[in-house]
Regions:
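Active-site loop segments of alpha/beta catalytic cores
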Residues: 1-138
Length: 138
């Protein structure tokens, strides 16, 4: 998980490889989506330098912070807690959390748990997660 990698190790060992990978994918015309489990807050400056199109954000990370660091063009997905919100929560809790995510992230944003959804998740919670959320703002 990202929370176990220091910024120094990330910048020295991982970021150069990610840069090469992202450059190669973009050279082929691909959009690039990054998924990193865990708290990536301390890695955001390096991630911002990659030119990502989409990033998945774990529930441990502030969407507001990610938006500030990565900017308005990167699509964000996340960041409901897969256990507390989706597995053990209620449809109403999920709807409320999604509304908060939209407010915090702004657009572009995709509904996502930020990590794997447990297989024992109640069907009504999955349906609530998949409901379209119409937010018009004020």
């Amino acid at each position: 998980a990202a929370s176990q990698v220091s910024p120094a190790i990330y910048e020295r060992l991982i970021l150069p490889r990610e840069r090469r990978l992202v450059r190669g994918l973009k050279a082929m015309g691909a959009k690039v989506r990054m998924h990193i489990c865990g708290n990536i807050t301390h890695l955001l400056p390096g991630l911002a330098s990659l030119g990502l199109d989409v990033i998945d954000v774990d529930h441990m990370v502030s969407l507001i912070t990610v938006r500030k660091v990565l900017g308005p063009k990167v699509a964000m997905g996340g960041n409901l807690d897969p256990v507390a919100d989706i597995l053990r929560g209620t449809p109403d809790l999920i709807r409320a959390r999604l509304a908060r995510c939209y407010l915090d992230a702004g657009n572009p944003f995709m509904v996502n748990a930020g990590c794997e959804i447990p297989s024992a998740t109640p069907a009504q919670n999955l349906l609530a997660l998949c409901e379209p959320l119409a937010y018009t703002g004020s």
